Design a protein with these regions (language model features):
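Active-site loop of short-chain dehydrogenase/reductase
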Residues: 5-6, 77-78, 123-137, 147, ...
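Conserved glycine-rich cofactor-binding loop
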Residues: 14-15
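Conserved NAD(P)H cofactor-binding loop of Rossmann-fold oxidoreductase domains
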Residues: 84-89, 236
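Substrate-binding pocket helix/loop in short-chain dehydrogenase/reductase
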Residues: 92-93, 100-105, 198
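Active-site helix of classical SDR
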Residues: 116, 155, 163
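Alpha-helical segment proximal to the catalytic Tyr-Lys
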Residues: 121, 164, 168-172
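C-terminal substrate-recognition "lid" of short-chain dehydrogenase/reductases
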Residues: 175, 209-233, 238
Length: 241
């Protein structure tokens, strides 16, 4: 266990990768601010003086402000941010609607934009650097026949692009910006999907566990010389199938 006395923000923190990440950061001695729409009612975490829970839609600027204020007010800093909140749904390209596009942009792009702006502003004030990790998907780099995801990839591909841009923009200030690109992960998103089929989508023939993704995020959060990196944790899916 580390005793970093640093503060990490995790959006989409009530289940799956987000919940696993909150627990991992707490185990490593971080103060943690976790957000989801109803996280205070989720029952996912034991009470801790090192944990603050903030309800609300991360796609709204007001919620992002509340999250940032919770980190600064309760713990005094923002040292790490993981933009884990996101949505995905599969349709044929011609079936996506304007409402679908707006939902994807709202959560995946605006949800990233507002809280990341608050985090970077605070990191610049602190002058001690910081870490931002975005969550994308291996489908950005390697589309799979039968997995129709063109419109969601507009947003996820955008996150990969902005990851590299921000890494360059803030490198001299010690603010590192990276991304993790998972493949198929054993989370509630896939609870109704046939497991045997899901295993065929990754060359290693396995479904990734939440802990695999969490380990990658923690690594990037703490890897002081890594920035602008997109780390694939997908059983080789980004290489081919």
């Amino acid at each position: 266990m580390q005793n970093t006395q640093k503060t990490a923000i995790v959006t989409g923190g009530s289940q799956g990768i987000g919940a696993g990440l909150v627990k991992a950061f707490l185990d490593r001695g971080y103060n943690v601010v976790a957000n989801s729409r109803n996280i205070t009612k989720s029952g996912a975490f034991e009470a801790s003086d090192k944990l603050a829970l903030v309800d609300g839609n991360a796609a709204e600027a007001a919620t992002a402000a509340k999250i940032a204020e919770a980190a600064k007010g309760k713990f005094g800093s923002i040292d790490a941010l993981v933009n884990n909140a996101g949505i995905y749904f599969s349709k044929h390209f011609t079936d996506y609607t304007v409402e679908d596009l707006r939902s994807l942009v709202s959560v995946n792009i605006e949800g990233f934009l507002f809280i990341t702006q608050f985090a970077i502003k605070q990191m610049l004030v602190q002058k001690t650097g910081g870490s931002i990790v975005n969550i994308t998907t291996t489908l950005v780099d390697h589309p799979i026949a039968g997995i129709n995801s063109a419109v969601p990839m507009i947003t996820k591909g955008g996150l990969e692009a902005v990851t590299r841009s921000l890494a360059m923009e803030y490198a001299k200030q010690g603010i590192r910006v990276n991304a993790v690109a998972p493949g198929i992960v054993d989370t509630p998103m896939h609870k109704n999907d046939p497991k045997d089929f899901l295993k065929t989508l990754q060359p290693m023939g396995q479904i990734s566990d939440v802990k695999d993704i969490v380990a990658a995020i923690v690594y990037l959060t703490e890897a002081g010389q890594v920035t602008g990196e997109v780390l694939h944790v997908d059983g080789g899916a980004h290489v081919g199938k």
